[in-house]
Amino acid sequence: MARIAGVDLPREKRVEVGLTYIYGIGRPKANEILVKTGVNPDTRVRDLTDDEVNKIREIIDKEYKVEGDLRREIALNIKRLTEIGCYRGRRHRMGLPVRGQRTKTNARTRKGPSKPVSGKKK
């Protein structure tokens, strides 16, 4: 089983898809990596040679932030925004949408489940 960036890639999938199991690598980056290493995207992960796996691992380690490093950088960016007290930081702290979306209706993903408001008493 190919292990790249601390992630076991699924053996039965194509390399192009298998690389997307690594946090921070989607289809476009996976294709870019395969072009740089000269590996055919249609190859199955189980059919990769050790040399090809090492090439892929080398490119990812050198040129991309993935897994823990990427998660840490994102967390630090959010922490920095909250500490300086800018608008985006306040929105993160309050658990509201950060990028200007409306909140009168919708925004349930960020706000959590709706809190029922009791109707008018008779």
From Swiss-Prot:
Residues 92-122 are annotated as: Disordered. It comes from the Bacteria. InterPro entries: Rbsml_uS13_C, Ribosomal_uS13, Ribosomal_uS13-like_H2TH, Ribosomal_uS13_bac-type, Ribosomal_uS13_CS. Residues 101-122 have a biased composition (Basic residues). Keywords: Ribonucleoprotein, Ribosomal protein, RNA-binding, rRNA-binding, tRNA-binding. GO terms for cellular component: cytosol; small ribosomal subunit. GO terms for molecular function: rRNA binding; structural constituent of ribosome; tRNA binding. One of its GO terms (biological process) is translation. SUPFAM superfamilies: S13-like H2TH domain. It holds the Pfam family Ribosomal_S13. Part of the 30S ribosomal subunit. Forms a loose heterodimer with protein S19. Forms two bridges to the 50S subunit in the 70S ribosome. Belongs to the universal ribosomal protein uS13 family. Located at the top of the head of the 30S subunit, it contacts several helices of the 16S rRNA. In the 70S ribosome it contacts the 23S rRNA (bridge B1a) and protein L5 of the 50S subunit (bridge B1b), connecting the 2 subunits; these bridges are implicated in subunit movement. Contacts the tRNAs in the A and P-sites. This is Small ribosomal subunit protein uS13. It comes from Ruminiclostridium cellulolyticum (strain ATCC 35319 / DSM 5812 / JCM 6584 / H10) (Clostridium cellulolyticum). The gene is rpsM.
